[in-house]
Structure formats: structure tokens, C-alpha cells
Amino acid sequence: MNKNHPELLQNVTDVTAARSLPLWKRENLTTTEPDWLAEEVPVALVYNGISHVVMMASPKDLEIFALGFSLSEGIVESSHEIYGMDIIHGCNGIEIQVELSSRRFTELKARRRNLAGRTGCGVCGVEQLNDIVRPLAPLPFTQTFSLDNLDGALRQLASVQPVGELTGCTHAAAWLTPQGDIAGGHEDVGRHVALDKLLGRRAREAWQQGAVLVSSRASYEMVQKAATCGVEILFAVSAATTLAVEVAERCNLTLVGFSRPGRATIYTHPQRLIAGDKNA
């Protein structure tokens, strides 16, 4: 057990996400003591029998990951276009077998890519540079969010990151209500995978009004995934990249970085953000 924070184990409900191992510490190199590490395994997504992508991920919440990935990558537009899903655990990793509608599978074969990435990587193996940034439909302006309500959400973020609190090794993605409460969240060793899990959960729960908060930086792919799923506001704890800002500007997504209590850097479309408690 992590001797510094044994209480954190009470919040880890899925023991497959972390494992205790004997380790040496700088202050005592002669003996080992148990500490917790996050699990990381290869997860293959297979559509209608054809391997599409291999991601390094935390081995939990895999069905909603597959749903979120399928939605955020534009493979499907609705969960109704997925007819079935099986998760196969093997010696070398995990395979998620997804059955698509025939129309969606035909479209997927036309633009099929096959990649084996680093943790959460979604670019490695893309066949053409033009495939990196997909065309995105402009998002509507249907909601606002109070920056004052963001502070409360930031304080709650650790509640959806128990493995991260225990190991210091995961990213989190959370769905914020307009009131600044966290409706739900997911964590993973890969920031893209954490976001895909959240987007899959959002589709299942039919969350509409609100925003996404991620514990990581905002890359272009995080923006692309969020926008593809119709998310209008994306908050990141760390910075955004130039390509992320360009993509967000083009698709009308409100992108905010350095989201910390009492501060934030707004990169694009600030008109969705308001000062003061929206409920006041």
C-alpha cells in the first residue's frame, strides 16, 4: 500500500487499473517497500473482424472507450450504428470486437488506417498528412458557462481520478454541468483515451448542456474529438497547442487553457463564457 496515502485505496473500485509492486526509494536503497503503479495494456479495436487501431490504455471502462472512440473519430454518428461489442482478454493485451452497420463499415474501409501508437496516440500510422485534421462542421452557439463555476469543478476533479491520486500516473476527463458540478468523469494513462471514455459516457447518458474539463494539455486531437461529438466548450488544465487553437477557431469551439482556480486563458470564442455565478 502507498504508505503516504493509504486512504486513496478506498476510492479505487477497479483493481485492474492499478497494481502494487515492491520498489526502492531514494531514502532507502537497501530494502523495498510496496507502492502502486497504474496498469497500461495494449487495447486493439477491431471493426467487423478487421483490426483498426491499437492504443495503450488503462484496462477499465473499455466498452464506453470503444463507443467514445467510434464517435469521436467519426466512425459512427450514433451508438445505434454499433450492433454489438465483445471484449476479449488475451495474453498480449485486450481486443474489443465491434460490429458496425454495413454502411458505416463500408465507409470505414474507404478511409481505413492502421496504427500502433504510444500512450493515447492517435496520429501514428495515419497514411496521409491530409488525414490528420478532419473537416469539422461548425458548432452552434447554444450555451454559456460561468467561469466562476469552473473553480468548483476544478476542486472536484480529483474525485474522478482515484487511480491518478494513488499512482500519479493518469489523466482525467470530466463532464461539467452548467452549474459547475461534475456529472461524471473517467481517467486513463492516455489523455486521448480518457477523453474518449468520457465522450462514450456522455453519449450513453445523453448529457447535452455543459462542458468538458481535461487534466492535460489541449492538443488538436482533443479539440477534434470534442468538436466531432458536438462539445462546444473545452477546458484544459494545461496549455493548448497552436494547431489546437486553429482547429477550435475554425469549428467554433470555445477553448480554454491553464484552467486553475481564479484564472484561465481563453484562446477562442469567448462569447460562451460569462462572469459571475450563472445560478445567482
UniProtKB/Swiss-Prot annotation:
GO BP field: Mo-molybdopterin cofactor biosynthetic process
Q: Name one GO cellular component term.
A: cytoplasm
Question: Pfam families, from UniProt?
Answer: FdhD-NarQ
Q: Which UniProt keywords apply?
A: Cytoplasm, Molybdenum cofactor biosynthesis
Protein location: Cytoplasm
**GO MF term list:** sulfur carrier activity; sulfurtransferase activity
Q: Which residues bind Mo-bis(molybdopterin guanine dinucleotide)?
A: F258, S259, R260, P261, G262, R263
The UniProt entry lists the main location of this chain as cytoplasm
Its family?
A: Belongs to the FdhD family.
Function comment: Required for formate dehydrogenase (FDH) activity. Acts as a sulfur carrier protein that transfers sulfur from IscS to the molybdenum cofactor prior to its insertion into FDH.
**What is the protein name given in its UniProt record?**
Sulfur carrier protein FdhD
Annotated source species: Cronobacter sakazakii (strain ATCC BAA-894) (Enterobacter sakazakii)
Q: Which gene encodes it?
A: fdhD
